[in-house]
Amino acid sequence: MSGASVTFEPGARTAWHTHPLGQTIIVTAGCVCVQRESGPVEYVRPGDVVCFSPGEKHWHGATLTTAMTHIAIQEKKDGKVVDWMEHVSDEQYRGEK
């Protein structure tokens, strides 16, 4: 199992990705944008916990105006914790699909 406290500056976000054994994020500061494949952009705040199922395609990041920090927890499978995919477009980031 691995975990880290991660900070994103305003406008920063991950690429689309999956975790072979899932991921849990715990928001500790700011506001986090989260989107699962085919779902809307959701906004989560300090104290909120978000769980992603194994293989669930998603991204997360800060809002355009607010930095954020979250604790990310995931387990390794065959030495791997993440599979990176395509970048999140500006339209996806803004929730325009």
What do these predicted ranges mean?
Residues 19-38:
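Glycine- and acidic-residue-biased ligand/ion/polar-headgroup-sensing regions
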Residues 59-97:
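Double-stranded beta-helix
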